[in-house]
Design a protein with these regions (language model features):
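Negatively charged, low-complexity tracts enriched in Asp/Glu with abundant Ser/Thr
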Residues: 1-38
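Generic signature of intrinsically disordered, low-complexity, basic-rich segments
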Residues: 2, 16, 50, 79, ...
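Ampiphathic alpha-helical segments that act as solvent-exposed interaction surfaces
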Residues: 6-9, 64-94
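Generic detector of ordered, mature protein regions
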Residues: 22, 26, 31-33, 45-47, ...
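Intrinsically disordered, low-complexity regulatory segments enriched in Ser/Thr/Pro
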Residues: 40-77
Length: 94
């Protein structure tokens, strides 16, 4: 995800009350970090692959994975559509 797009998605999510931040995986890879609870977060789309998927981290350790969301790989997907998919994601860790 380009840094500008990541910031757009974060801004939309924050407007909806979601605790979101830009995640910088490297100098050229950015994504979206969503706080799930006080020790768990999801890091979205920092791998550069098509589609939205997330690694779920608890205390900094991988505890789950959200597989690629169908339809999120479209090239014409908007920032608002990406934010909507992230906001509705299932983080079931049971």
């Amino acid at each position: 995800m380009q840094p500008e797009r990541a910031q757009q998605v974060v801004d939309i999510l924050r407007g909806w009350g979601v605790a979101a931040h830009v995640a910088k995986a490297s100098a050229f890879r950015h994504g979206v970090r969503v706080v799930i609870d006080w020790k768990t977060e999801a890091v979205w789309d920092t791998d550069g692959a098509a589609g939205l998927e997330a690694q779920v981290l608890g205390d900094g350790r991988l505890v789950g994975f959200v597989p690629p969301i169908p339809g999120s790989e479209r090239e014409d997907i908007t920032a608002e559509q990406q934010a909507h998919l992230i906001a509705r994601a299932d983080y079931d860790l049971t």
